[in-house]
Amino acid sequence: MIVKNEEKNIRKALTWGKNIVCEQIVVDTGSTDRTVEIAEEMGAKVFHFEWIDDFSAAKNFAIEQASGNWIAFLDADEYFSEEDTKKILPLLAQLEEERRKLKIPLIVRSSLANLDDEGNATSVATQARLFSNVKNLRYDGSIHETLMIGGIKAPRAYEARNLLTVYHTGYTQKVYKETHKLERNIDILKKTVEKNPENYEAWAYLGDSLLANKQMKEAEKAYNLVVKHMNNDLFQERRDFVFCNLLKIKYYSNVNDENELMEIYEKSVEFACLAPDAEYWVGCWMLDRGKLQRGIEYMELALHRLELYDRDGNMDMAGSLSNVYGRLFEAYRSLGQAQEAVKNGTLYLRMEPYGEAVLMEMIRLFKGGAKGKEIASAILSFLSKLYDLSRAKDKLFLIRISRKLMFNELENLVYNLLTKEEKDFFNTNELNILGQ
């Protein structure tokens, strides 16, 4: 990893893989805190590299210090979970055999979840953080660097998106404020485009950094310049990201002119945009304005595209899937399409089991105008597929929902599932549990 002033992260960064790596390489680019001291204390090999506003140069220097057959190149604010770490060596053993047969470098693409200040995933991307250690596989690009083979994007990748996830904490507002990372990136990219105004990839990355820094107007200008000069020289992922972020800007700018929004979307179709976020933002815009059927169509298309998408790049939609299912539930319910509403409501509750509003509407849909123990039993049978009825928390939650709905029969059925100790606890704390 390359680091600068990462004393808050370096210990965790060097801990996750301690038991599976043969060496840990830390390249410091000018820390003034305890980063180097902590890294050396933890047994890492520490090297120093003079910062020259070029992430690829620093990363390639780090690669040159590595002696293993495979490299895990994570930033100091990234880590694999303990569970996923255990999967890495068996996977690499399998891939090493394949690599020797093919005699070409291999990279492993895993999911990357960007976490907010509360630890929730805000977006999900696919990134290459594991790759074979061979001479011609190196990073390219002064910022937002990409693995290349002899100047050409690495073509061979093993898809491990469903197997491995890197968690990234570096995009939180707290980190931005503490590190001034965005200002640094914006400064580097502005210098790049000043030096070469026709470097539209750099303009696209500048738009990303400006947008992350909440400079939406400036970001929009940068993206529009890229669209004006759009061609096949840009990687597919970059083209996708430009269009998706332009649509995102229109959405958050609360643009009311549908033509203005759809002009961008149609342009994205013209350039064969594959990313599901394009349809996602159009779908959100439509649903916000009560255009339910069209909103549903775009959201469903976004979900279909998400299943097929195998490119790099962040996806806001992937970090907001529960929101997608929740919005589809409400739209289908409003249109009286109960079957589709139940399907999406169920998917939402699998992700957000304690989402009261959706659960209450689901129960109302099932109940209709029916009364009595029979309908309550049928609903409880359905709920047992979503909730653990041996778990006190789930039972007490369902009792609270039943009380809010004044569904006495369902409340009684769930109450009777409580153990004696749970009933005693409920009877003592009823007002607090029910939120009354």
What is the predicted function of each stretch?
Residues 1-23:
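Short, well-formed alpha-helical segments that are part of the catalytic scaffolds
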Residues 8-12, 33-42:
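Acidic helix N-cap motif at the loop->helix transition within catalytic regions
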Residues 220-228, 256-269, 294-304, 338-349, ...:
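Alpha-helical repeat scaffolds
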Residues 16, 28-38, 51:
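A conserved acidic beta->alpha catalytic loop
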Residues 57-63, 81-218:
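Catalytic-site signature of metal-activated, phosphate-bearing donor transferases
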Residues 22-31, 47-48, 75-76:
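Short beta-strand/loop segment that forms part of the nucleotide-sugar
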Residues 37-57, 61, 65:
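Conserved donor nucleotide-binding strand/loop of the catalytic core
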Residues 71:
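Short aromatic/hydrophobic "clamp" motif used to bind/position activated sugar donors
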